[in-house]
Amino acid sequence: MLKKLMQSVLPELGKNSRKAPRDVKYPGKRDAVDGNTAVIMVEREASDAAGAYPITPSTQMGEYWAEAAGDGHINISDRPLIFVEPESEHAAAGVTAGMSMTGLRAVNFSSGQGIAFMHESLYAAVGKRLPYVLNMGCRAITKVSLNVHAGHDDYHCIDDTGFIQVMAKNAQEAADLNLIARKTAELSLTPAIVGQDGFLTTHLIESVMIPERELVAEYLGRPDDLIDTPTPAQKMLYGPKRRRVPTLWDVDTPLQSGTVQNQDAYMQATAGQRPYFFDHIEKLAEGCMAEYGELTGREYQRISTYLADDADYLVVGMGSMIVQAEAVADYLRETRKLK
């Protein structure tokens, strides 16, 4: 059955799904890599610093970052990479937050129980408006027994923290969504999570158009760039222009952070998150996706669809299963006339 499925689908795959290629400025550089590698090939150009503790199946991301740092890799900001491996995932979340507070473009990598362990720190990262990216190799959280393979327990256990969340279906999306999530995070001042399925994407080698270093530089810019403040609420805080990654901890201009708020002030600060920050994310994300599509030809939407315009049946999902679901949709249309 599987052989018949592939023989039927492969010649037709993409006939209805892919637009004709067009000339774009940054089509990418073709390579054969897994999802973990695709992430690091982007992050080592974009980011300044990583705080991470290794955990399967995202271990390779931290390892590859550490290798790049050890080799003296210089990113688009002309900085050598910084890597700190503390004693746990909980500490890694604090380290990454601290890096972001000092104005560095920061990143973390984790999975499964590691995400659950750092859970409490993620709320504070949102409340402090720290625009870092957490890369997640999505893994089942231990219940009746240990399982290191794919599951979305960790991805959904942080739904209530306020992080921006995006999920890649393959290694190509893991690379592209890192850049899109990063730009959205830095414009909205809200941290972002980029998920990919453990082993099914993190360790599966496939053909990927790796984003060029020049694309990363043009699309993201440097963390110390002065940009036009993108929202009215941010203008109240920073004025008409601000640093792309704000510096909250600065030894030259020290300030206090994380103070105690009693009921009235805490209520106002918490309620104000939505109108002043969260409500702007949708528009900012759509703008970042549109700009990325113009530069690369690879277009993204907040909710992606496949052959849905005239469909009678819809399969709803996320992650690596989408690749198979798209192939099944092609097969059923071709062989069963089912839409």
Language-model region placement:
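Conformationally flexible catalytic loops at phosphate/diphosphate-handling active centers
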Residues: S77-L81, A192-S304
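Glycine-rich beta-alpha junction loops
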Residues: R139-A140, D197-H203, G319-M321
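Conserved thiamine diphosphate
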Residues: V148-G198, T202, I210, Y219-T229
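Flexible, glycine/charged-enriched surface loops at secondary-structure junctions
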Residues: K15-K19, D23, L189-G195, L295-Y306, ...
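Generic long, charged, amphipathic alpha-helical segments
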Residues: A325-K339
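Short helix/loop capping segments that flank catalytic or ligand/cofactor-binding pockets
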Residues: M118, V144, H203-I205, Q324-E326
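Thiamine diphosphate
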Residues: M1-C157, G162, L179
